């Protein structure tokens, strides 16, 4: 039997549709308009595309949004000065520095210069520390893993006792994903490039999250029949002279083994942007002393 194809695009649209109502009510009840500022250094075409998509979605939802474009020659100190300026602006609730930044700039220094209350990517050490110590209600959670967990819960809400395997150990997806699954009482294994017999671990997983950045890396023979498969990868490949995007999982094979699987595109990607918007609204509420407002609209 073919797997349930988890329509991340439709689910993300449901989330943002509800969030738009939340934002409108926030304006009516508190005269608060959440504001997201994206800082983009350099002229990487993919980064510019991502930023345009984020800004378009923010404006559609009724957020204030602005993109600050800086040349690739921008010094680290100049970027830090700009972030301090945004940190000190009470009208700015969310700050995102689009990654990657040019090589002469220390990415971690920049991330940790952002006020953690405004760190809508959820990458600041304060937010990471709170997440990893079980304080997810008191931090901003990285958008992609948060979106992945939401997708998993559309298939089964009770994850307690499930065996989960996360392929990848990045700070952006792999590590926080493992942490979120632990928080749901899963038994979590993280595998990576140095893992021996990686497929053996995958084949025992009730929940398999692939975030490795290698096209069609996960074969159907690695997947436990009936598993939930979340494919975070988005890789550009060329087939018969035509470029297309594929995930880290061999979708054509895997959909005949898994019980539920995300497609690429249209799976995890839209959820990342949706939860960036959620984080921005939550950040605005937190900075304004408005407690649990977003949670009245969305089951987070």
From Swiss-Prot:
<comment type="pathway">
    <text>One-carbon metabolism; tetrahydrofolate interconversion.</text>
</comment>
<dbReference type="GO" id="GO:0004477">
    <property type="term" value="F:methenyltetrahydrofolate cyclohydrolase activity"/>
</dbReference>
<feature type="binding site">
    <location>
        <position position="234"/>
    </location>
    <ligand>
        <name>NADP(+)</name>
    </ligand>
</feature>
<dbReference type="InterPro" id="IPR000672">
    <property type="entry name" value="THF_DH/CycHdrlase"/>
</dbReference>
<dbReference type="GO" id="GO:0004488">
    <property type="term" value="F:methylenetetrahydrofolate dehydrogenase (NADP+) activity"/>
</dbReference>
<keyword id="KW-0368">Histidine biosynthesis</keyword>
<dbReference type="InterPro" id="IPR046346">
    <property type="entry name" value="Aminoacid_DH-like_N_sf"/>
</dbReference>
<comment type="similarity">
    <text>Belongs to the tetrahydrofolate dehydrogenase/cyclohydrolase family.</text>
</comment>
<comment type="function">
    <text>Catalyzes the oxidation of 5,10-methylenetetrahydrofolate to 5,10-methenyltetrahydrofolate and then the hydrolysis of 5,10-methenyltetrahydrofolate to 10-formyltetrahydrofolate.</text>
</comment>
<keyword id="KW-0554">One-carbon metabolism</keyword>
<dbReference type="GO" id="GO:0006164">
    <property type="term" value="P:purine nucleotide biosynthetic process"/>
</dbReference>
<keyword id="KW-0511">Multifunctional enzyme</keyword>
<keyword id="KW-0521">NADP</keyword>
<keyword id="KW-0028">Amino-acid biosynthesis</keyword>
<dbReference type="InterPro" id="IPR020631">
    <property type="entry name" value="THF_DH/CycHdrlase_NAD-bd_dom"/>
</dbReference>
<dbReference type="GO" id="GO:0000105">
    <property type="term" value="P:L-histidine biosynthetic process"/>
</dbReference>
<keyword id="KW-0560">Oxidoreductase</keyword>
<feature type="binding site">
    <location>
        <position position="193"/>
    </location>
    <ligand>
        <name>NADP(+)</name>
    </ligand>
</feature>
<keyword id="KW-0378">Hydrolase</keyword>
<dbReference type="GO" id="GO:0009086">
    <property type="term" value="P:methionine biosynthetic process"/>
</dbReference>
<dbReference type="InterPro" id="IPR036291">
    <property type="entry name" value="NAD(P)-bd_dom_sf"/>
</dbReference>
<feature type="binding site">
    <location>
        <begin position="168"/>
        <end position="170"/>
    </location>
    <ligand>
        <name>NADP(+)</name>
    </ligand>
</feature>
<dbReference type="Pfam" id="PF02882">
    <property type="entry name" value="THF_DHG_CYH_C"/>
</dbReference>
<dbReference type="InterPro" id="IPR020867">
    <property type="entry name" value="THF_DH/CycHdrlase_CS"/>
</dbReference>
<dbReference type="InterPro" id="IPR020630">
    <property type="entry name" value="THF_DH/CycHdrlase_cat_dom"/>
</dbReference>
<protein>
    <recommendedName>
        <fullName>Bifunctional protein FolD</fullName>
        <ecNumber>1.5.1.5</ecNumber>
        <ecNumber>3.5.4.9</ecNumber>
    </recommendedName>
</protein>
<keyword id="KW-0486">Methionine biosynthesis</keyword>
<keyword id="KW-0658">Purine biosynthesis</keyword>
<dbReference type="GO" id="GO:0005829">
    <property type="term" value="C:cytosol"/>
</dbReference>
<comment type="subunit">
    <text>Homodimer.</text>
</comment>
<dbReference type="GO" id="GO:0035999">
    <property type="term" value="P:tetrahydrofolate interconversion"/>
</dbReference>
<dbReference type="Pfam" id="PF00763">
    <property type="entry name" value="THF_DHG_CYH"/>
</dbReference>
């Amino acid at each position: 039997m073919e797997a349930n194809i988890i329509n991340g695009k439709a689910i993300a649209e449901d989330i943002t549709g509800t969030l738009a109502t939340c934002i409108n009510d926030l304006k009516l009840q508190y005269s608060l308009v959440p504001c997201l500022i994206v800082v983009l250094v350099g002229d990487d075409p993919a980064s510019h595309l991502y930023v345009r998509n984020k800004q378009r979605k923010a404006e559609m939802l009724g957020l204030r949004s602005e993109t600050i474009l800086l040349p690739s020659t921008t010094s680290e100190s100049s970027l830090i000065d700009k972030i301090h300026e945004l940190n000190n602006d009470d009208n700015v609730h969310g700050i995102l520095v689009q990654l990657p930044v040019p090589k002469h700039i220390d990415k971690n220094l920049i991330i940790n210069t952002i006020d953690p209350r405004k760190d809508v990517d959820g990458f600041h050490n304060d937010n990471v520390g709170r997440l990893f110590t079980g304080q997810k209600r008191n931090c901003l959670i990285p958008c992609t893993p948060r979106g992945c967990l939401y997708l998993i819960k559309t298939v089964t809400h009770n994850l307690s006792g499930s065996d989960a395997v996360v392929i990848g150990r990045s700070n952006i997806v792999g590590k926080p994903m493992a942490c979120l699954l632990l928080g749901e009482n899963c038994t979590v294994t993280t595998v990576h490039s140095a893992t021996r017999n990686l497929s053996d671990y995958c084949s025992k997983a009730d929940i398999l999250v692939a975030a490795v950045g290698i096209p069609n890396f996960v074969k159907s023979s690695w997947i436990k029949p009936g598993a939930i498969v979340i494919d975070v990868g988005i890789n550009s490949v060329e087939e018969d002279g035509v470029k297309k995007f594929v995930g880290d999982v061999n979708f054509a094979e895997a959909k005949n083994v898994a019980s539920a699987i995300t497609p690429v595109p249209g799976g995890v990607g839209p959820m990342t942007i949706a939860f960036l918007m959620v984080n921005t609204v939550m950040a605005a509420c937190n900075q304004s002393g408005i407690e649990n407002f977003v949670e009245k609209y969305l089951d987070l």
